[in-house]
Amino acid sequence: MNTPLSPVSGRLASLDILRGFDLFLLVFFQPVFVALGQRLNFPWLNDILYQFDHESWIGFRFWDLVMPLFLFMTGASMPFSFSKFKNAPNKWHIYRKIIKRFVLLFIFGMIVQGNLLGLNPDSLYLYSNTLQAIATGYLIAAIILLHCSFRYQVLITLLLLLLYWIPMTFFGDFTPGGNFAEKVDRLVLGQFRD
């Protein structure tokens, strides 16, 4: 099924609806639904509420889809927004947009969850938020999208998946404190991590 672009804005309607649904879950539905469920204390509702929190370590819940869905939507919208710049001889205009978006998302992430406005280095977290993950993924994907053919985009994607899978599988263990990603976080970010 093809989802038409809006004739007024040129935006993909299905992507905007999905973005709205994800924001609705994050900002309204989950907080209100959880507060209501705690107030009413219905046993059948507790089973549903269980899905609106993250799993502590191993497992999967519905709420674990919210952040990856934002990353997916960012990536899905990039070919539409970058198509007019792909073959442009001077890409400086799009680079300015990419850098501006990266910096803004990163700073907003530090404000929201990184305690940036607290101005206390002991409680400052440099990389602790979905917005920062979106910013970093956006920057990397933008560079790949603007400079690589579709064939190389697929190849780079497969290589990145492999480069992530190998250390996660063969180095460290599968405990919260012993997995490879946790070790890299401790090494690179040190005290500035959430």
Go through each PLM region and give its residues.
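Short, motif-level signal for alpha-helix interfacial/capping segments enriched in acidic residues
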Residues: 1-2, 112
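N-terminal signal-anchor module of multipass membrane proteins
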Residues: 2-90
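Hydrophobic core segments of alpha-helical transmembrane domains in multi-pass membrane transport
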Residues: 23-31, 141, 160-168
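Residue-level marker of positions within ordered structural domains that often coincide
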Residues: 32, 80, 145, 149, ...
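Transmembrane helix-loop junctions in multipass membrane proteins, especially transporters and channels
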Residues: 34, 38, 42, 84-89, ...
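Membrane-interface interhelical loops and short amphipathic "cap" helices
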Residues: 37-60, 115-128, 175-194
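Transmembrane alpha-helical segments and their boundary/interface "anchor" motifs
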Residues: 64-69, 84-113, 117, 122-162
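Long hydrophobic alpha-helical segments that form multi-pass transmembrane helix bundles
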Residues: 150-194
